Amino acid sequence: MSEQIHEQPHLKRVLGRWDLVLLFVVAVFNLNVVPSIAANGGVTVWLWIISLLLFFWPQGIAVIELAQRYPGEGGVYLWAKEVFGDFHGFLSGWCYWTNNMLYVPTVMLYFVGVSVFALGPGHAALADNKNFAMVMSLVLLAVLTVLNIVGLGVGKWLNNVGAIGTFVAASVLILLGITIFFRFGTTVTASDFRIPADPRFVLNSFGVICFGLVGLELASVMGDEIRDPQRTLPGAVAWGGVLAGALYIGATLTLLVSVRKDEISVLQGIVQAVSHMAAKVGVAWIIAPFAVMLSLSIAGIGSAWMGGSARIPFVAGLDSYMPSWLGNVHPKYATPHAALIVQAVVSLVLVVINFYASGGVQEAFQKMLSLAVVLQLVPFLYVFAALLKFGVRKPFESRRYSRATLLFAGTAGLVTTTLGIVLAFFPAKQITSVWKYEVSMIGITLAFLLLAVFFFFVYSRLKTPRVTAVKHAEAARIT
């Protein structure tokens, strides 16, 4: 009896430094976010630079500092819990998890839209067939779920292949852009990099950019599966961050130089841009191989976020703030299979809703993306607030960074994160009805937050009798 009470499920340590670097690249750098941002013009380059300096860099500092102070499985959930208490930890983890219920379906949509180009330009119209798109999305969702249940020892290879696909796809895009620039020039002028007279549509991009730069914390969510995390994590964060940031700016500039901003499609924008550029330089044959590489990249993104975020309900299940069976691990593969299955089922429902209950595909995509931005950034309010709390604490306890560094990173990160959340409520130009957009944004966000409150307070009441039972069992064992 006592052995069952004290025994906690464990996950295998299978991730090395370069596994983490590739994980960071495939999780942070998402080529398909670039078109929705670049469609707003050259001014977004300045938003990228501001976000890299005031959000991404502080994020790296926060991940390394907090991972050293609080090593272990759980990431943003564990950090908020240790610094601010149980409820804030649960809310942070809940938002991190539920955001992926909205984000993973958009990844499925990316995959379908891009993969049909691998069959040739004549099959591109298949992406507009709702039945085909839904079936293919659900097949990918099932495959990713199975791979992550089998374990990161297997699933990490999809992440790694996805990272390689990302590098190849980004390299092809940038090289084509450079070729177009030197052979045909560009219509981009200095005025395109100025703030427009009506910046409303550009404002939404700032939240999406911050969302696109999230991902460095993902490895810490898998903290118990990293080999020698104290030595492995800092170098992996540095390399992964530099590579992802450079790829984002390079890809955005390439799109702006090679394609008019009013011709950039939010969905399929990258592969359409490559098709346009490849035809211009006489290498149209690369479209299908490029689509394959980009499809691998998208599959890697889905695998990385599905596997990483599923660790949140796994840990929350262990702490009894959600149904205890979410803390179960697979008897053979030692993975949080229950949490992965629940996440897959919810994502399945959202995929079906996306294809059958939405208006225009681009508008539905933009709504889901904006909702994901809000929920994803909530945990980072806690992350950066934690740095400020450490920075002002007396006496100061130094772990990796100085007081001044923690205060700068905490302040910069907290301000940019708050702005990113607020600006996500500004509608993008794809939105046709502003009031419907605002109602859905506020309503769905509140619904997710109220569900978090429900789960926490209902299961925390159930937790008290469990704790009492454990104490009685320990007393019986001692006597």
Regions found by a protein language model. Give the residues of each.
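C-terminal membrane-solvent junction of multi-pass transporters and transport-like membrane proteins
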Residues: 10, 158, 326-334, 377-430, ...
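Hydrophobic transmembrane alpha-helices that form the core helical bundles
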Residues: 36-40, 57-141, 146-149, 295-312, ...
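Hydrophobic alpha-helical segments and their helix-loop junctions in multi-pass secondary transporters
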Residues: 113-118, 164-193, 252-261, 380-395, ...
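Membrane-interface "cap" regions at the ends of multi-pass membrane proteins
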Residues: 1-50, 56-61, 70-73, 190, ...
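Helix-loop-helix junctions that connect adjacent transmembrane segments
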Residues: 11, 45-46, 122-132, 160-291
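Membrane-interface loop-to-helix entry segments
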Residues: 132-183, 237-242, 373-382, 402-413, ...
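TM-loop-TM module centered on a large, flexible mid-protein loop between adjacent transmembrane helices
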Residues: 78-79, 85, 117-123, 236-306, ...
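Membrane-helix boundary/coupling elements in multi-pass transport proteins
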Residues: 95-110, 213, 218-225, 248, ...
